[in-house]
Amino acid sequence: MGRKYFGTDGVRGKVGETPITPEFVMRLGYAAGKVLVSDRGSLPANEHPTVLIGKDTRISGYMLEAALEAGFTAAGVNVLMTGPMPTPAVAYLTRALRLQAGVVISASHNPFEDNGIKFFSASGQKLPDSVEEAIEAALDQPLATVAARQLGRARRIEDAAARYIEFCKSTFPNRLDLRGMRIVVDCAHGATYHVAPHVLHELGAEVVAIGNEPNGFNINEACGATHTPALADAVRAHHADIGISLDGDGDRLMMADAHGRIYDGDQLVYVIARHRLETGYMKGGVVGTLMTNLGTEHALARIHVPFERAKVGDRYVLKRLHANGWFLGGETSGHILCLDKHTTGDGIVSSLQVLRALRETGKTLDAFTADLETYPQVMINVPVVKGFRLSDAAAVTVAVADAESALNGSGRIVLRASGTEPLIRVMVEGRDGDLVRRTAEMIADAVRAAAAASDIAV
């Protein structure tokens, strides 16, 4: 079944444009509420289902929170609200408080003009496609408020941050601490601004926090996991031992060593995998995505760690991990899954797994990744209008075939449509950086020409 509103990470768009309007989001809350009411599971008949709503620091979050609250309560669902809270915190709290669902108002790494809604199940995992499709189907039904006695109640919970801070600390061994380490943490002026520094401080680190002054408009602005020069500069300026960079909703992680060198999701997953292998608690293999650097795959093979690729999106990485019974996976962008620690990607928890590796071995990030060669990789995002399909572009198919011939087995080409934005992503990687760059530009030109020829403007 095709999905009209849900992408790879929930519903997302420009604030004030469908679907991110108060009217639509209220209907979305109502539709999700009706699905929850109809699928009560073991919930007693006289109890209302309860959902948890968290949000990042965008100014529009307050408006959308009120709309969701109205929709859910109109459907007879109780609502708990946390205020600004990282996405993985909502996943954890939904599970810990035994609620029926969690909802996050966030557009992750996007600028403040965007926002989105994503859902977690009672187990703290992203909803399966079938449930999202049921919610979409319910959106077509009229909004009919339940009888007054059946209306849901809404209230704020005050101890959400403290609960989550303790959870994060519990994923770090009791016998270790971070005393003697100076750590820069970039919170992207986002949802982790009030929890990430506390977690690190309470574990003993000397913390230098940047990107921790949200004003509703500066989330992800020249900071955070999608703009790592800010972290690198701060690490060097403060003579820190290490740096941690999170994105606006706290589910992505990048790190920097003492020299300001940045380590992406591929490299950090490798650090965790290698440490777990060396200490005897690596179970199974690693799941990456179509975008995971080929050098990471080769490095894992050299230490005899199995590796699989999933479609882009942490939900698909999670699906393959469950299918294999493995625990560790992630994306180049910094979504890292450590399923023995959490049910979803968590930037803070993942950073603690890397810090554990460094503390237990005395190694640096550079030493851990010395045998990991990251191959040159070029990504070009080609804007397109909705409706452009690569499958209809014969000229692009020919260009890719020519490019593969030029690479002669020494690299990879990936073309895919973004799940959250109207873009075609062209990725080429290989050992020869110049050849990789020329190849990516050739394919991107072919995509632009094909889009223009089909009268779907770029």
From Swiss-Prot:
InterPro entries hit by this protein: A-D-PHexomutase_a/b/a-I, A-D-PHexomutase_a/b/a-I/II/III, A-D-PHexomutase_a/b/a-II, A-D-PHexomutase_a/b/a-III, A-D-PHexomutase_C, A-D-PHexomutase_C_sf, A-D-PHexomutase_CS, Alpha-D-phosphohexomutase_SF
GO biological process: carbohydrate metabolic process; peptidoglycan biosynthetic process; UDP-N-acetylglucosamine biosynthetic process
PTM per Swiss-Prot/TrEMBL: Activated by phosphorylation.
CDD domains per record: GlmM (cd05802)
Catalytic activity: alpha-D-glucosamine 1-phosphate = D-glucosamine 6-phosphate
Record has Magnesium as a keyword: yes
Gene3D superfamilies attached to this UniProt entry: Alpha-D-Glucose-1,6-Bisphosphate, subunit A, domain 3, Alpha-D-phosphohexomutase, C-terminal domain
GO terms for MF: magnesium ion binding; phosphoglucosamine mutase activity; phosphomannomutase activity
Residue numbers annotated as active site: 108 (phosphoserine intermediate)
Cofactor note: Binds 1 Mg(2+) ion per subunit.
Enzyme Commission numbers on file: 5.4.2.10
Alphabetically ordered keywords of this record: Isomerase, Magnesium, Metal-binding, Phosphoprotein
Swiss-Prot/TrEMBL cofactor(s): Mg(2+)
GO CC annotations on file: cytosol
Catalytic class of the enzyme: isomerase
PANTHER family assigned: PHOSPHOGLUCOMUTASE (ALPHA-D-GLUCOSE-1,6-BISPHOSPHATE-DEPENDENT), PHOSPHOHEXOSE MUTASE
Function: Catalyzes the conversion of glucosamine-6-phosphate to glucosamine-1-phosphate.
Entry similarity comment: Belongs to the phosphohexose mutase family.
Protein name: Phosphoglucosamine mutase
Organism, as annotated: Thiobacillus denitrificans (strain ATCC 25259 / T1)
